[in-house]
C-alpha cells in the first residue's frame, strides 16, 4: 500500500482547479441514513486517498511546468517603424535660405530592424545618428531636397505566447493575434501599416522555456501506471488523464488540471479543445500552503472534538460540524435524528458563496433542491434557527477567505502606444505622433525673406537685374565723359587774368569789374 502520508489528491484537485480554498463543502449526493454508535465516528483525513491498490513504487524522472506557468508566457519583443525625414532647401536671389522638414513613413525590412535593434541595445552611436535630421544641401536659386531613412525601435513590446498553438497575442496585432512567427518568418504585422513586431530573441525556442525536470516515484500495478508521487511528496493519479501538447512537447493533462510529461504504457486519448492546463504560479503555491495549514488545524480541532465526545459520551450539533469533509470528494455525513446518531455516505462539493446553498430563508440546497429537515435538524451541525433561518456553524469563520483576497493584486503593465485602441492614425504616409517622440524636433528654419518666385520668375529676375546693372554702368560712363570735357575750357578762361563782360544794349566794353567798382561808371 502506498504510504498514506504521500497520497494527496483531494488537496490538489480543489486549489488548482478553482484557485481558492472553499468557504464550505456540502454533499451534492447523500446516501441513506443509518444509526451508528459514537465509536463509529471518525475524523476525515482530508490529506490522504488510496488509489486502486497500486502498491509498487519505483523511482523515475518526469518533466513538469515551472512555477509561474502557464497563465501567460511572456515573449519580449519590440516594434520597428520606418520613417523618412525630408529636408527641402530653397535659396532665393538675395541668398536667404529656407529649410523645411517633412516626415513620412516607409515599410521596414526585418533584417534592417534587427540590425537597428542590436545597435540600440548595444549603445551603438549609429542608432542615435540614424534618427538625426539630415544635413540639408543648398544651391543658389534652386530647391534642393535631402532625405534620410530611419528605423524607430520602441521596446519593450510584450506579447503573450499561447503554449497550445504557439500563437502570439497582443493588442498591437491587427486582430489581437499573430500566428506567423516561425523559423521562416520572424516578424508579425501590426495595426500600423509601417510598423512590424519582432521578438527580442530570434531563437523562438528559448521563449517557450516553461518546463523543468523533476524526480519522483511511479505507482504501478503490474504494467499499468496508476499515478506517481511527485518531487514534493504529493500523489497524483493518472485516472482520467488525456494527452496534450504544450509548446510542441507531448504530455498528460491530469484530472486536477496539472500537466506532466512521462513515459506510460497506458492507452490515453487526446484532450478535447476545452481541456486546458490550470495555472501554476507562486500564488497557487501560497494558496496550497495556506490550505495545508488550514486542513491540519481543522483536523486537530476534529480530533479534539472527537476526544471530547468519547470522554463525555455525548454528542452536540456543534461537535458534529468538525467531522465534515473539507475538500471535494467522497466522505461521511453525520446527524442526530430523535436523539439517535446517524451516518450516511456522501459526495462533497465545494461552495464558493453562501447563496449557492442558502437561496432563500429556511432552504438548504442539496443536490439542486431544498433538503428536508427533521425537527429543525439537517446534518453536520446544520440546524434551523428559531427565526426560520438556516444556521451553519462555519458561516462565521471567514478568515481563510480573507487570506485568499489578500493574495489578489492588480498589475498595471507598460502599454505599447500601438496597443491603445483609441489611437487614430493619419491618412496617407505622413509620420504618426507615436514616433515623433522618439525623433528630434523638426521645424521650418527660415534665414531671411523668401521671394517665393517660380523657376521661370527667377530667370526673369536675373535677366532684369543684369540689364539694369548694364544700363547703370553705361549711364555712369556717360556722365564721367561729360565731366572730363568741361574741365579744360574753364581752365583756359581763368588763365587770361581779365574778365570781359558784354552788354548787348550799348556794345560798350568794360575793361574790368574793378574799374566799374571804383567809379568809372558810364551812363547811357
UniProtKB/Swiss-Prot annotation:
Annotated signal sequence range: 1-19
Pfam families the record matches: PH_Rhabdo_glycop (PF24834), Rhabdo_glycop_CD (PF24833), Rhabdo_glycop_FD (PF00974)
Glycosylation: residue positions: 56, 266, 338
GO cellular component: membrane; viral envelope; viral membrane; virion membrane
PTM summary: Glycosylated and palmitoylated by host. Glycosylation is crucial for glycoprotein export at the cell surface.
Ranges of the Intravirion topological domain: 481-524
Keywords, in A-Z order: Disulfide bond, Glycoprotein, Lipoprotein, Membrane, Palmitate, Signal, Transmembrane, Transmembrane helix, Viral envelope protein, Virion
Keyword DNA-binding listed: no
Cellular compartments annotated: Virion membrane
Biotechnology: Primary surface antigen capable of inducing and reacting with virus-neutralizing antibodies. Almost all human and veterinary vaccines are based on the functional aspects of the G protein.
Domain of life: Viruses
Disulfide linkage: 43-302, 54-226, 80-113, 178-188, 208-247, 242-271, 363-370
Residue intervals annotated with topology Virion surface: 20-459
Chain ranges passing through the membrane: 460-480
Membrane topology: Single-pass type I membrane protein
InterPro entries membership: PH_Rhabdo_glycop, Rhabdo_glycop_CD, Rhabdo_glycop_FD
Residue positions of covalent lipid attachment, annotated as S-palmitoyl cysteine: 480
One biological process term in Gene Ontology: entry receptor-mediated virion attachment to host cell
Record-stated family: Belongs to the lyssavirus glycoprotein family.
Protein's job: Attaches the virus to host cellular receptor, inducing endocytosis of the virion by using different host proteins including TFRC, GRM2 and ITGB1. In the endosome, the acidic pH induces conformational changes in the glycoprotein trimer, which trigger fusion between virus and cell membrane. There is convincing in vitro evidence that the muscular form of the nicotinic acetylcholine receptor (nAChR), the neuronal cell adhesion molecule (NCAM), and the p75 neurotrophin receptor (p75NTR) bind glycoprotein and thereby facilitate rabies virus entry into cells.
Oligomeric form and interacting partners: Homotrimer. Interacts with matrix protein. Interacts with host TRFC. Interacts with host BST2; this interaction inhibits viral budding by tethering new virions to the cell surface. Interacts with ITGB1. Interacts with host GRM2.
Additional information: Arg-352 is highly involved in rabies virus pathogenicity. Its mutation dramatically attenuates the virus.
The name this protein goes by in its record: Glycoprotein
Species of the source: Rabies virus (strain Vnukovo-32) (RABV)
Organism lineage: Viruses, Riboviria, Orthornavirae, Negarnaviricota, Haploviricotina
Amino acid at each position: 500500500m502506498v504510504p498514506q502520508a504521500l497520497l494527496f489528491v483531494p488537496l490538489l484537485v480543489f486549489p488548482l482547479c478553482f484557485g481558492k480554498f472553499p468557504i464550505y463543502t456540502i454533499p451534492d449526493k447523500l446516501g441513506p441514513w443509518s444509526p451508528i454508535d459514537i465509536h463509529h465516528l471518525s475524523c476525515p483525513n482530508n490529506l490522504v486517498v488510496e488509489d486502486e491498490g497500486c502498491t509498487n513504487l519505483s523511482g523515475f524522472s518526469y518533466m513538469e511546468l515551472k512555477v509561474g506557468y502557464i497563465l501567460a508566457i511572456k515573449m519580449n519583443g519590440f516594434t520597428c517603424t520606418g520613417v523618412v525625414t525630408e529636408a527641402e532647401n530653397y535659396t532665393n536671389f538675395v541668398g536667404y535660405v529656407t529649410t523645411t522638414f517633412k516626415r513620412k513613413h516607409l515599410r521596414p525590412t526585418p533584417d534592417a530592424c534587427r540590425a537597428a535593434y542590436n545597435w540600440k541595445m548595444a549603445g551603438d552611436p549609429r542608432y542615435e545618428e540614424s534618427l538625426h535630421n539630415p544635413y540639408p544641401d543648398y544651391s543658389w536659386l534652386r530647391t534642393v531636397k535631402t532625405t534620410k531613412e530611419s528605423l524607430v525601435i520602441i521596446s519593450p513590446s510584450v506579447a503573450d505566447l499561447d503554449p497550445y498553438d504557439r500563437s502570439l497575442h497582443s493588442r498591437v496585432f491587427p486582430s489581437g493575434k499573430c500566428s506567423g512567427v516561425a523559423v521562416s518568418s520572424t516578424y508579425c504585422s501590426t495595426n500600423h501599416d509601417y510598423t512590424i513586431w519582432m521578438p527580442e530573441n530570434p531563437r523562438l525556442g528559448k521563449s517557450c522555456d516553461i518546463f523543468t525536470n523533476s524526480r519522483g516515484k511511479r505507482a504501478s500495478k503490474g504494467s499499468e501506471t496508476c499515478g506517481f508521487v511527485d518531487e514534493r511528496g504529493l500523489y497524483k493519479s493518472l485516472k482520467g488523464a488525456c494527452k496534450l501538447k504544450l509548446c510542441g512537447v507531448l504530455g498528460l493533462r491530469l484530472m486536477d488540471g496539472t500537466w506532466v510529461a512521462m513515459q506510460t504504457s497506458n492507452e490515453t486519448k487526446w484532450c478535447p479543445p476545452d481541456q486546458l492546463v490550470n495555472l501554476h504560479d507562486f500564488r497557487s503555491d501560497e494558496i496550497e500552503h495556506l490550505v495545508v495549514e488550514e486542513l491540519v488545524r481543522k483536523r486537530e480541532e476534529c480530533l479534539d472534538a472527537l476526544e471530547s465526545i468519547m470522554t463525555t459520551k455525548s454528542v452536540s450539533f456543534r461537535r458534529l460540524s468538525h467531522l465534515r469533509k473539507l475538500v471535494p470528494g467522497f466522505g461521511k455525513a453525520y446527524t442526530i435524528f430523535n436523539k439517535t446518531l446517524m451516518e450516511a455516505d456522501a459526495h462533497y462539493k465545494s461552495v464558493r458563496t453562501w447563496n449557492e446553498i442558502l437561496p432563500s430563508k429556511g432552504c438548504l440546497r442539496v443536490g439542486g433542491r431544498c433538503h428536508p429537515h427533521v425537527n429543525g435538524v439537517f446534518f453536520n451541525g446544520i440546524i434551523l434557527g428559531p427565526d426560520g433561518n438556516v444556521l451553519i456553524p462555519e458561516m462565521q469563520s471567514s478568515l481563510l477567505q480573507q487570506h485568499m483576497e489578500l493574495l489578489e493584486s492588480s498589475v498595471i503593465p507598460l502599454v505599447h502606444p500601438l496597443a491603445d485602441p483609441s489611437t487614430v492614425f493619419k491618412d496617407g504616409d505622413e509620420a504618426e505622433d507615436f514616433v515623433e517622440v522618439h525623433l528630434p524636433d523638426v521645424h521650418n528654419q527660415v534665414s531671411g525673406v523668401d521671394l517665393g518666385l517660380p523657376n521661370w520668375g527667377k530667370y526673369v529676375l536675373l535677366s532684369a537685374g543684369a540689364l539694369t546693372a548694364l544700363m547703370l554702368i553705361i549711364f555712369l560712363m556717360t556722365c564721367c565723359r561729360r565731366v572730363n570735357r568741361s574741365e579744360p575750357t574753364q581752365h583756359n578762361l581763368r588763365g587770361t587774368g581779365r574778365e570781359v563782360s558784354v552788354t548787348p544794349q550799348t556794345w560798350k566794353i568794360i575793361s574790368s569789374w574793378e574799374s566799374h567798382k571804383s567809379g568809372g561808371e558810364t551812363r547811357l
